[in-house]
Amino acid sequence: QADPNAFYGLM
């Protein structure tokens, strides 16, 4: 499962 924080970092 990917980390939600990583997704936010991309944004």
Curated annotation (Swiss-Prot):
The keyword Cell division does not apply. The modification Methionine amide is found at residue 11. Keywords: Amidation, Amphibian defense peptide, Neuropeptide, Pyrrolidone carboxylic acid, Secreted. Coiled coil: none annotated. It is found in: Secreted. InterPro entries: Tachy_Neuro_lke_CS, Tachykinin_dom. It comes from the Eukaryota. It holds the Pfam family Tachykinin. Expressed by the skin dorsal glands. One of its GO terms (biological process) is neuropeptide signaling pathway. The modification Pyrrolidone carboxylic acid is found at residue 1. One of its GO terms (cellular component) is extracellular region. The keyword Transmembrane does not apply. Its main location: secreted. Belongs to the tachykinin family. Tachykinins are active peptides which excite neurons, evoke behavioral responses, are potent vasodilators and secretagogues, and contract (directly or indirectly) many smooth muscles. This is Uperin-1.1. It comes from Uperoleia inundata.
